[in-house]
């Protein structure tokens, strides 16, 4: 599988982050609210909060912004209650898609997600229609830089408990079990490494190759979903064409 195909979304996001940084921070802030409500404001005793903080740092969210979000969440006893929902369905050409939302209005979210699917020739499905094609895994993505030795990094990751290590185009990708994600992430952080991504994700068992026409339609669908304030994550099994650019 080509590096561009598998890691297309990561590479594409790098160019969009500045334009959408405020929206990304808002979404992560919602995740912090949910994590604090579930397990309290201390990252030491709240694994979910630790994971969200790692995601925030990978997205260059400033530490003071993270801390303000935690304090705000812990102080708002009457804060908005967000509901976590995962929608499943098919994009153009039958691409399997999972959409995670955090919402205070599930009717609004359902309508918006359904519109994004149908606009590009896809459709929402019933619960379980595609989730069996994915596994929950930890993924840590590190940008290739001068002075970062691939073999040393691989041994570091595997010794810490990683399941897999890949070198793809401009990045190294470390995959872990959901259970070992925190341990591996902390081991790499202790070595001074910075991450492009560090989070628990739904990873497809296999990828489906799509042509350029389908890739263009699907990217439009992804853009609509990712622009929705309620949508936190979008996972899919599409393998984009080699050399394709939106």
Swiss-Prot record:
It comes from the Bacteria. One of its GO terms (cellular component) is cytosol. Transmembrane segments: none annotated. GO terms for biological process: regulation of DNA-templated transcription. The keyword Ribosomal protein does not apply. Keywords: Cytoplasm, DNA-binding, Transcription, Transcription regulation. Signal peptide: none annotated. InterPro entries: Integrase-like_N, TACO1_YebC-like_2nd/3rd_dom, TACO1_YebC_N, Transcrip_reg_TACO1-like, Transcrip_reg_TACO1-like_dom3, YebC-like. The keyword Nucleotidyltransferase does not apply. GO terms for molecular function: DNA binding. It is found in: Cytoplasm. Belongs to the TACO1 family. HAMAP family: Transcrip_reg_TACO1. This is Probable transcriptional regulatory protein CLM_3478.
């Amino acid at each position: 599988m080509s590096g561009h195909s598998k890691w297309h979304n990561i590479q594409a996001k790098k160019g969009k982050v500045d334009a959408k940084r405020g929206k990304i921070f808002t979404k992560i802030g919602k995740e912090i609210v949910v994590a604090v409500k579930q397990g309290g404001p201390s990252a030491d005793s709240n694994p979910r909060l630790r994971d969200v903080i790692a995601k925030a740092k990978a997205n260059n969210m400033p530490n003071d912004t993270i801390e303000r979000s935690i304090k705000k969440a812990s102080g708002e006893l009457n804060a908005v209650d967000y509901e976590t929902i995962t929608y499943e369905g098919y994009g153009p050409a039958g691409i399997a898609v999972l959409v995670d939302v955090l919402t205070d209005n599930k009717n609004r979210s359902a309508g918006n997600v359904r519109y994004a699917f149908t606009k590009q020739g896809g459709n929402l499905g019933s619960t379980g229609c595609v989730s069996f094609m994915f596994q929950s895994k930890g993924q840590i993505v590190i940008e290739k830089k001068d002075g970062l030795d691939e073999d040393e990094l691989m041994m570091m990751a595997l010794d810490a408990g990683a399941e897999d290590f890949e070198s793809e185009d401009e990045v190294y990708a470390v995959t872990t079990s959901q259970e070992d994600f925190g341990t591996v992430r902390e081991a790499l952080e202790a070595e001074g490494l910075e991450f492009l991504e560090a989070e628990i994700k739904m990873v497809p068992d296999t990828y489906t190759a799509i042509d350029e026409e389908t890739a263009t339609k699907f990217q439009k669908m992804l853009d609509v979903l990712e622009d929705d304030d309620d949508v936190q994550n979008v996972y899919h099994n599409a393998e984009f064409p080699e050399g394709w650019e939106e």
